[in-house]
Amino acid sequence: MRVIVFVKATDDSEKGILPTTELLEAMGKFNEELINAGIMRVGDGLKPSSQGKRIAFDGPGRTVIDGPFAETRELVAGFWLWEVKDMDEAVAWVKRCPNPMPGPSEIEIRPLYEMADFQ
């Protein structure tokens, strides 16, 4: 099964505060483990929402909304796309992950729809 793994944003990540060298090294090693295990398909960090835009759809209308976006808890600071046997395997890998932020942080795992889900 494929899952997307979201690293949730924090006040620091929204301020553009970059990870420490130690954290970058630890995450690099973790990513290497994921790749060597055949789990990781892609992954990257995101710049703060102040550098992003949202497009709001309402029927035929489109409205562009400039960042930053208010609800930091709902924002994403990074992501991975993984191929795992099941959700339990994804959870086990996330538990091995270095804390992605200084201080409290949160990682969310969401399964992707597969073609079989639509049949």
Predicted features and spans:
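Conserved, structured core segments of small domains
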Residues: M1-Q119
